């Protein structure tokens, strides 16, 4: 005779309705049954460590100094006015940065932490896009590549709009992937929303949006009306941005791009995408990174070529770079590595396709991630691979004890104005000073035929990492023209004179 026992709930606890669980319990079971989420969590944790641990290590460079020293003002309205006149991008990043700095401040760590958040958020977004378009394994591999990439870490530690462009382009690419896979019209709409936000961050989001829109039009014939309507909405936003873009272009912020040869810019593209902004510091490190990179590329092509999603990711990545190159033919020269940095996302998804090759694929991706982390650490410990250290240069110059003119090295006017308290730029006219400090990059050619103004005598020479400077003083303040001061420069490159009054 069998005996049936009935289990009872623990004292003081009510039984849960069948099928209903707590949020924490659901998450715990999901983690147990989905090791993919554990892998993603570990990858995100590694990405956080790489991005947040060294936020304050490097000085602001020239463009970051513009962000914190000129664009971000006490009022949001004044900030938008500075974006209009001082920047070459739409205002979305600066609105978010203005809000962020109300809480976290304008220091290197304070404002860059916003970029680090954006950079970290990009990692799971790329996982989502990769697993949707190619495979779950490819999504994990792509997320790992983005987490470890020196280029992605670099922009995640920069107080500029590029990392928000990367994040929003990744979100748009994710919705694009879902739209292609599920063939759902609402996903096309969400793709358009993400694309508009990317455009409001940076005009060059269009380089990714155009090939994605064409792909949606071709691949989703049953949704073409939705694709056309969504593309028209994006085009309307582009039209609304035209007056701002034209005004900013007339300020000449990007004219320097065309002064760099196309071949040199292609070289920069490879160096910056693979090794970080300043390239590799040694031939050994170059080989350590390039060998697994080439292996990953070959294995990805071999293992995933038959996958339509993989081919689509590779095509979007290549076309994001190709669109501005094609525009150059028509006289619109915007091609520069950071202007096509959003291509890193679909290319990472394509690279993640290497794991389709059993064992060798995962080995290649793991080796490439290890090489990327090695390169990122090398940047942290090698000053010449970092941003120019204007912060230490300002410390070496010391506080101004008398009215002085500081003749900065090329690109140094904005960061020196920021780090030298009470300083401002002077482009013309005359100044009254009793000290002249002239600064140059250590590696720059030094002018030997210089004219020291009458009444000034040599008072010493100093240095800081990456810079040298000379100081000339006078027994009394003397009035000099900006033109006369330019004859004292150590470097032949022109940079505005900085006037600093003692406090």
Describe every region a protein language model picked out:
Residues 3, 31, 35-503:
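Membrane-proximal helix-loop-helix interfaces that form the catalytic/acceptor-binding platform
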Residues 1-33, 368, 501-503:
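Short, intrinsically disordered terminal tails adjacent to the first/last structured region
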């Amino acid at each position: 005779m069998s005996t049936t026992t009935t289990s009872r709930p623990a004292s003081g606890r009510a039984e849960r309705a069948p099928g209903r669980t707590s949020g924490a319990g659901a998450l715990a079971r999901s983690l147990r049954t989905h090791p993919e989420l554990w892998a993603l969590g570990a990858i995100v944790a590694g990405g956080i460590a790489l991005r947040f641990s060294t936020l304050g290590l490097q000085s602001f460079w020239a463009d970051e100094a513009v962000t914190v020293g000129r664009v971000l003002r006490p009022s949001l309205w004044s900030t938008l006015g500075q974006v209009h006149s001082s920047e070459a991008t739409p205002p979305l990043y600066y609105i978010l940065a203005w809000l962020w700095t109300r809480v976290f401040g304008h220091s290197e760590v304070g404002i860059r932490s916003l970029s680090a958040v954006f950079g970290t958020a990009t990692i799971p977004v790329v996982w989502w896009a990769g697993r949707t378009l190619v495979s779950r394994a490819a999504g994990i591999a792509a997320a790992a590549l983005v987490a470890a990439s020196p280029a992605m870490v670099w922009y995640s530690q920069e107080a500029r709009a590029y990392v928000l462009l990367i994040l929003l382009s990744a979100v748009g690419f994710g919705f694009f992937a879902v739209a292609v896979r599920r063939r759902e019209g609402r996903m096309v709409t969400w793709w358009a929303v993400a694309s508009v936000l990317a455009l409001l961050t940076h005009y060059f989001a269009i380089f990714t949006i155009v090939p994605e829109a064409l792909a949606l039009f071709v691949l989703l014939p049953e949704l073409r009306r939705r694709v056309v309507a969504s593309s028209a909405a994006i085009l309307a936003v582009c039209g609304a941005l035209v007056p701002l873009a034209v005004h900013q272009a007339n300020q000449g912020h990007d004219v320097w791009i065309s002064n760099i040869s196309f071949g040199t810019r292609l070289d920069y593209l490879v160096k910056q995408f693979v090794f970080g902004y300043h390239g590799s510091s040694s031939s050994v490190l170059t080989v350590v990174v390039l060998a697994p990179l080439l292996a990953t590329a070959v294995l990805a092509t071999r293992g995933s070529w038959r996958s339509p999603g993989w081919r689509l990711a590779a095509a979007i990545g290549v076309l994001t770079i190709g669109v501005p190159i094609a525009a150059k033919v028509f006289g619109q020269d915007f091609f520069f590595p950071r202007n096509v940095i959003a291509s890193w996302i679909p290319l990472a998804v394509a690279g993640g396709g290497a794991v389709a090759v059993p064992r060798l694929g995962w080995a290649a991706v793991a080796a490439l991630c290890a090489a990327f982390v090695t390169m990122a650490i090398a940047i942290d410990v090698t000053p010449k691979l970092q941003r120019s250290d204007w912060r230490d240069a300002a410390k070496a110059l010391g506080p101004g004890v008398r009215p002085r003119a500081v003749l900065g090295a090329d690109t140094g006017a904005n960061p020196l104005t920021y780090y030298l308290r009470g300083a401002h730029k002077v482009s013309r006219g005359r100044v009254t000073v009793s000290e002249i400090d002239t600064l140059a990059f250590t590696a720059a050619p030094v002018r030997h035929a210089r004219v020291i103004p009458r009444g000034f005598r040599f008072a010493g020479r100093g240095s800081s990492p990456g810079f040298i400077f000379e100081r000339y003083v006078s027994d009394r303040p003397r009035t000099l023209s900006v033109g006369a001061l330019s004859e004292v420069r150590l470097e032949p490159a022109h940079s505005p004179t900085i006037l600093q009054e003692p406090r």
